[in-house]
From Swiss-Prot:
Pfam families: Trm112p (PF03966). This is Multifunctional methyltransferase subunit trm112. It comes from Schizosaccharomyces pombe (strain 972 / ATCC 24843) (Fission yeast). PANTHER family: MULTIFUNCTIONAL METHYLTRANSFERASE SUBUNIT TRM112-LIKE PROTEIN, UPF0315 PROTEIN-RELATED. It comes from the Eukaryota.
Length: 126
């Protein structure tokens, strides 16, 4: 699962939909892989408005990556090549292959196996 995907996932439990603690999910016991991909500045510029920067920072720091700036950058063109490469590496090349995502509100654990998060809840948790 790419970190870009993790930036859009939250707890599926109805009790958690209105809780700010349910997003982002905490990433624990993660195994990471880096997959080299072609840099596409236009994609990064287009996706940046949809990125929850604070959630992304929390996730990357839980994974030991401190390469992103504290403040969300204004990415309006491809002139900042260093920033583009850093975002590309974090959002698109870094993958969580194994691990868990944990809801900070209800504590539900979503396992990640072979890069795929299991976001299903049992009937009693819905």
């Amino acid at each position: 699962m790419k970190l870009l995907t993790a930036n859009f996932l939250n707890c599926s439990n109805k009790k958690c939909t209105s809780s700010p603690e349910a997003f982002p999910l905490d990433v624990v016991d993660a195994k990471l892989a880096i997959q080299q991909l072609e840099l596409k500045p236009e994609f990064l510029i287009g996706i940046m408005p949809r990125i929850d920067w604070n959630a992304l920072l929390k996730t990357t720091r839980q994974l030991g990556n401190y390469s992103l700036p504290d403040e969300k950058p204004d990415l309006v063109d491809d002139s900042d090549e260093v920033l583009l490469k850093s975002l590309h590496n974090v959002l698109l090349e870094t993958e969580i292959t194994e691990g868990k995502m944990v809801c900070g509100n209800c504590g539900h654990v979503y396992p990640i196996f072979e890069g795929i998060p299991n976001m299903l809840l049992s009937e009693s948790e819905i």
